[in-house]
A protein has these predicted regions:
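Short coil-to-helix segment of the ABC ATPase nucleotide-binding domain corresponding to the Q-loop/switch region
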Residues: 4-11
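Conserved ABC ATPase "signature" region
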Residues: 18-35
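Conserved ABC ATPase signature
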Residues: 39-49
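Hydrophobic anchor residue at the start of the ABC signature
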Residues: 53
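Conserved catalytic motifs of ABC-family nucleotide-binding domains
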Residues: 60
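Catalytic Walker B motif of ABC-type/P-loop ATPase nucleotide-binding domains
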Residues: 64-67
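Helix N-cap at the start of a conserved alpha-helix in ABC-type nucleotide-binding domains
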Residues: 75-77
Length: 137
């Protein structure tokens, strides 16, 4: 929400949850605490993406659906966002579904569904997921 600070952006969705996460702790884990009083237009695209992820995470969900979370980001920022998602999965125990056209990202998943024309054409379990830091495209 462009007219709210980063902290206010996250606070506004916290009210939708019976058991929200601590906002300051979440801001720290997202690397946004020092930017909490800035407006989204005052930070980078990657930080704006982290804010969007924070709005979803503050509700303490069991499932996070991310549609093209790296689509508009440069390579370095994309990898930072993917590493953040790994951290979210480990720290909060949140299952994450990533929808992407970037096939390289599939290497970090423990399960990959490939779709064609809206139908599942392949369902693969990945026995050895790769860390986001090791991905390259």
């Amino acid at each position: 929400v462009p007219d709210l600070t980063i902290k206010e952006n996250i606070e506004v969705t916290a009210h939708l949850s019976k058991n929200p996460l601590n906002i300051d702790d979440l801001l720290r884990s997202l690397g946004l605490y020092e930017h909490r009083n800035k407006f989204p237009r005052q930070v980078s695209g990657g930080q704006q993406q982290r804010c969007a992820i924070g709005r979803a995470l503050v509700k303490n969900p069991g499932l996070l659906l991310c549609d093209e979370p790296t689509g508009a980001l440069d390579y370095k920022t994309s990898k930072e966002i993917l590493q953040l998602m790994e951290d979210v999965n480990r720290t909060y125990g949140c299952t994450i579904i990533i929808v992407t056209h970037n096939a390289a990202i599939a290497r970090m998943a423990n399960r990959v569904l490939r779709l064609r024309d809206g139908r599942i054409v392949e369902d693969v379990l990945n026995e050895s997921p790769v860390a986001a830091a090791e991905l390259d495209w």
